[in-house]
Each structure stands twice: as structure tokens, then as C-alpha cells.
Amino acid sequence: MQAACWYVLLLLQPTVYLVTCANLTNGGKSELLKSGSSKSTLKHIWTESSKDLSISRLLSQTFRGKENDTDLDLRYDTPEPYSEQDLWDWLRNSTDLQEPRPRAKRRPIVKTGKFKKMFGWGDFHSNIKTVKLNLLITGKIVDHGNGTFSVYFRHNSTGQGNVSVSLVPPTKIVEFDLAQQTVIDAKDSKSFNCRIEYEKVDKATKNTLCNYDPSKTCYQEQTQSHVSWLCSKPFKVICIYISFYSTDYKLVQKVCPDYNYHSDTPYFPSG
């Protein structure tokens, strides 16, 4: 009966079997399992009672009651004692290994529109020299690629005279009438959407030698100005309109840049 009981315990509950054998071998050591906290029980079993609880001794005592008496000598090194902090660290590390690694964040792909060509400062310039005035106007056009573009002008003059630089539709008539220089027809207002974004004018005066008579001193006025226009769709073609008036010289000029140069669709003038 005793042997049958041992076999049942061995097959059903191996843990209970080991504890029972430990009690049969040395009854005094069973107090280690009853006293003390649950956290330090494992540490006491594998340190103080390592000789009495060796696996080779437990197995040999178990198989001696059988007909074929066999002693098994299994080497088992006593493990090093672990502190409570070591056990917590081990549990924390094992938990971290099981957690899935976060996916690397990919940078969003920004689809940028195809930027069109632009006119630089050297692509447009107007240089006017008279006896009493020296004028230089440069400009550039920048297409922002989002349906808008900017037009910049720089004006530098020395002498006396009136200069006007503006943007007009291609249907603007070239004429000397000052009253009609800034007038835009109603039919062109839908295709011409431009406004002044920035404007600055600096003036200074100085006395220099006269151009017509170097032996005399003339009063000259220097003017520097910067202006920028912002245009947006819908638009077709813009033209640069320059009007210059002086005591000895008059000039009205309209310059329309090649629209095919900075646009995907060709422009066909009408009217």
C-alpha cells in the first residue's frame, strides 16, 4: 500500500511528492516550509537544505523499495542564492522581451508640386539715360508652384523725372494718357488678379557735376524703390507697363514676358 501511494503521488503531484520526501528524510527541516515569508521560502530550500533535498538522494530513496534496486547518481550543482531584487529584475527583463517592438515611425512623404521656371533679375531690365535723368529698372518673377506668383521690381534713378511701373493685362493699350494707366477693363478683371504686397521708396539729394556742362554744379535727386506684386489664379498673362516722364524725354513701354516660358499651357492671345 505504501508503494502504491508513492506512485500515485509521483504521477499526479510531483511537487507534493518532493516536499513529502523531504519531510520523511529529515523531519526537522520541514519547519522551513512552514515558517518564514513566502518570498524567502525558495531561497531557504536551495541553500540551507541543499544536501538533504538533492535530487539524487530523493530518487535513490524512491527506487529502493522496488524489486530492481537501482541507485541513480545525478550531479546537480547547488544554484547560487538570488536576492528578492534579482528576482524582480528577472521578471521585469522577461516581460520587456515579450513586448512587441514599436515600429519605426516613417516620415510622411510630402508630394511637392513641380516648380515652374522663374525670371531672374537679369531677365528683365530697363535702362534709360537722358541729359537730366539716369534710370535703371530691374525685375523678376517667381512662381511659387501653388497657383500664385510674385513680381518684384527695383528702381534706381538719379535726376529729375517721374517713373511709373505697374502690372497690366496684355490688352492694355500703350498710350501717354496718365489717367488710363491704372485702369483695367471689366473683361480683364476676371483674368487679372494681382495686388501690391510690399512697397518702399527712399529718396536723397546731392550736388554733382552737370552732365551737359561739367563746369557747373547741378542739384540731383536719387530715388530707390522696391515693390512686389502678388498674383493668383485665375490669370492668363501679365505685362509690365513702364511710363517715364521728364522735362526732355517721355517713354511708355509695355513688356509681356513669354508666358510659355513659365507655364505648362501655351497662351494664345485673342482680340
UniProtKB/Swiss-Prot annotation:
Q: Carries keyword Iron?
A: no
The segment annotated IV (linker domain) runs over 177-185
> Mind listing the GO biological process terms from this record?
modulation of chemical synaptic transmission
Tell me yes or no: is Aminoacyl-tRNA synthetase among this UniProt entry's keywords: no
What is the tissue specificity?
Brain, only in a scattered subpopulation of neurons that probably represent inhibitory interneurons.
| Regions crossing the membrane | none
Location of region: V (Cys-rich): 186-271
Q: Where is the protein localized?
A: Secreted
User: What GO terms are given for molecular function?
Assistant: signaling receptor binding
Region forming the signal peptide: 1-21
Q: What is its main location?
A: secreted
Q: Where is this region: II?
A: 22-97
Region: III, residue numbers: 98-176
In its record, the post-translational modification comment is: May be proteolytically processed at the boundary between the N-terminal non-conserved and the central conserved domain in neuron-like cells.
Family membership noted in the UniProt record: Belongs to the neurexophilin family.
Q: What does this protein do?
A: May be signaling molecules that resemble neuropeptides. Ligand for alpha-neurexins.
Its name, as the record gives it, is: Neurexophilin-1
Species source reads Mus musculus
